[in-house]
């Protein structure tokens, strides 16, 4: 017997609440969801949308990735709150750092993933989270397996910072919604032109927030294609 996977479906995983400390002394809170039946083949390390606009570790794409990818694709999901951000998991210490101080949060999360033996980490940012990656993660290219950018606005990222990724030794993929509020396809092509090696994937009919099951599945399938290709496309039902 199978049951359709919907926006509220929570599939089996081994879930662990975590906390870790940044180099400037703040304790951040998060969660790791591990596959329950098999070893993880890769890790999705998420950086969430803008805290001052309601972004947190439970922003819906990130939450649904945690609910689905461990069971459907043997992908571990690491999600956490940036400094000063509250979610049902708890509150990370500190205050919003305008995308600058969050460098320490990214560094600490990556170190925590390594400490816990999480395999093949991919940094996956959404909106503000993409800015933190583009600004601060290039120096970590030898520690990660790839980067996926969801709805990158390029508000805080300079052309020089984009260009620094042009020779990155890892795949970098940007998912660009057709009707994005901040960076639709044509401006995205121009904005990423300093780094032509970045793969731009245009998402037909999509918007910045990826609302609805069709857009959610598109994002999760694109993630799965990169992190565990044999598991794509993801099933839309679950055996119960």
Region roles according to the model:
Residues 1-39:
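N-terminal cap/lid segment of alpha/beta-hydrolase-fold proteins
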Residues 160-162, 179-193, 215:
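Short alpha-helix in the alpha/beta-hydrolase fold that links the catalytic acid
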Residues 193-209:
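Catalytic histidine neighborhood in serine/cysteine hydrolases
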Residues 206-220:
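Catalytic histidine-centered segment of alpha/beta-hydrolase-like enzymes
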Residues 167-169, 174-176, 180:
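Short beta-strand/loop motif that positions the catalytic acidic residue
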Residues 125-133:
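Gly/Ala-rich beta-loop-alpha elbow adjacent to hydrolase catalytic centers
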Residues 26-34, 39-118:
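Serine-hydrolase catalytic machinery in alpha/beta-hydrolase-like enzymes
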Residues 155-156, 178-183, 208-209:
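Acidic catalytic loop of the alpha/beta-hydrolase fold
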